């Protein structure tokens, strides 16, 4: 899937931001 890695990275950063709280 083209662009799938980018989406995963964005989701990963989002989850990390949530856990950072």
From Swiss-Prot:
Summary of the function given for this chain in its UniProt record: Thrombin-like snake venom serine protease that has fibrinogen-clotting activity (217 NIH units/mg). It releases fibrinopeptide A and a small amount of fibrinopeptide B from fibrinogen alpha (FGA) and beta (FGB).
PTM comment: Glycosylated.
Regulation: Amidolytic and clotting activities are completely inhibited by NPGB and PMSF, but not inhibited by EDTA.
GO terms under cellular component: extracellular region
A GO biological process held by the record: proteolysis
Any one Gene Ontology molecular-function term assigned to this protein's record: serine-type peptidase activity
Family classification: Belongs to the peptidase S1 family. Snake venom subfamily.
EC number(s) reported in the record: 3.4.21.-
Tissue specificity comment: Expressed by the venom gland.
Annotated localization: Secreted
Name of the protein in question: Thrombin-like enzyme jerdonobin
Other comments on record: Represents a minor component of the venom, about 1% of the total venom proteins.
Occurrences of domain Peptidase S1 (ranges): 1-21
Subunit annotation: Monomer.
Provenance organism: Protobothrops jerdonii (Jerdon's pitviper)
Keyword terms of this UniProt record: Blood coagulation cascade activating toxin, Disulfide bond, Glycoprotein, Hemostasis impairing toxin, Hydrolase, Protease, Secreted, Serine protease, Toxin
């Amino acid at each position: 899937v083209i662009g799938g890695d980018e989406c995963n990275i964005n989701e990963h950063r989002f989850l990390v931001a949530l856990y950072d709280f």
